Amino acid sequence: KGEFITAYFPAERKAEFAKPNGVENIKLAEVYNTTENAGNILLKYMVHMKTQQSFARNEGDKEIVERIQQWFDRFESALQVLLDEKSIHLEYDYKNYNFKIRQEGREPFEFSELSDGYSSVIYIVSDLILRMDKNWLLDEEISQYNAQGIVLIDELETHLHIELQKKILPFLTKFFPNIQFIVTTHSPYILNSISNAKAYDLEKHVELENLAAFSSDELAEGYFEADEYSDTLKEELERYAQLCSGKELTEEERAERAELKIKFKNLSTDLSGAAREKFED
């Protein structure tokens, strides 16, 4: 009953928000199965909520009005973060039973006009929201989206530009604090976007921790072997070699050498074997 959430989002996911033809009495399911598309009724659900808010306002039920407004405020805040635009606001087109997104400097646009990346992310968020919302409707209080659960997302980076890859996992884990997210990815920007996570290489059968300590370049070129090792590491290794060969170092140079030595000693052999080998030489 929304108390434990399970969901799976495949790599080839396509966001489809069913457009309302009018007001519908949307009933959220007690339980959604793992692959069921709960998010596709988002717009219908929002129209239903606005209608209920209007009825409550007419009846003088301020508590319901405020609770529903809190829901919209929180969803709007999520859009502002995900779309990286603080001017984002939801606009209800009551004549056409639809919602549009208003952004400073452009005409209001529909959810269907979002790019594949933004659409995909908002779809995941809305799907999980609707899986949990049964709770607060029953308890007559605003949901904190703190239900426990396990969510699988295949190739999380699909359609996402770099900045969105960096923020998506931190956003999901903050918005849904009790959900365990298990994701597959080839993106270094996702791998180092969060500190309290473990990574497992399915090819090498290696478990890695705290990849947030490494730059995206180090992960991309060192771990993913896009190059023998990263350009940054190359420069640092050359600098370290230069400092090691120097005889009369300043206090600042000795401190820099010690700092680099500690960094290279802590490099995982699985993360950047070539760089470590170079250091040991």
PLM features per residue range, with description:
Residues 1, 75-86, 128, 132, ...:
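Hydrophobic, Leu/Ile/Phe/Ala-enriched alpha-helical segments that form helix-helix packing faces
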Residues 1-82, 220, 225, 237-241:
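Coupling/switch segment of ABC-type P-loop NTPase heads
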Residues 65-73, 118, 230, 250, ...:
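Generic detection of long, well-ordered alpha-helical segments
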Residues 80, 84-85, 177, 225, ...:
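Residue-level recognition of short, structured coil/turn motifs
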Residues 83-90, 136, 275:
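Long, hydrophobic, amphipathic alpha-helical segments used as structural scaffolds
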Residues 86-102:
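Long, charged, glycine-rich C-terminal linkers/tails
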Residues 97-229:
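Switch/communication elements of ASCE P-loop NTPase nucleotide-binding domains
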Residues 166, 208-281:
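Acidic, Mg2+-coordinating catalytic modules of nucleic-acid enzymes
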